[in-house]
A protein has these predicted regions:
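HAD-like aspartate-dependent phosphatase fold
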Residues: 1-135
């Protein structure tokens, strides 16, 4: 799966995911960007679609909010061919003392709204194994 060089990724995730994308030379928006770290209501009238977003990548994001989900939803809905990717589909995330919602719980919101499953590119999905074999 190749993203065209003129396209970028909208990230729901944290700094580690941004580092991985940058190390592969992949442009991205969202993620830890300050404008997406807000508790203000999301408004479609303020949203400016970026037609260069060719994929939405949903990972674990401990700062998830309605703005991030709404932007991801709009890119996937408006940008023809925009890929819906998930780092993994884990429903929970083990922490000391118990469990927290995992990355799959975050992408589930978009799955439900879009009626579309993401391509899981992390463990233990076939996409990751294909990438390992190709290297």
């Amino acid at each position: 799966m190749k993203l065209p060089p003129n396209k970028k990724v909208y990230v729901i995730g944290m700094a580690g995911l941004e580092t991985e994308l940058a190390s592969e030379g992949i442009s991205y928006v969202g993620g830890t960007a300050p404008e997406d770290h807000t508790l203000e209501p999301f408004s479609l009238s303020d949203f400016r679609n970026d037609p260069d977003v060719g994929a939405v990548l949903c990972g674990l994001d401990m700062h998830i909010n309605y703005t991030k989900l709404s932007k991801a939803f709009q890119y996937l809905r408006l940008n023809e061919g925009c890929l819906f990717l998930a780092t993994n589909t884990d429903s929970t995330y083990p922490v000391n003392g118990g469990l927290l919602p995992g990355a799959g719980s975050l992408s589930a919101t978009l799955r439900y709204a879009l009626k579309k499953d993401p391509v899981s590119i992390g463990k233990p999905g076939p996409t990751m194994l294909d990438c390992i074999k190709a290297k």
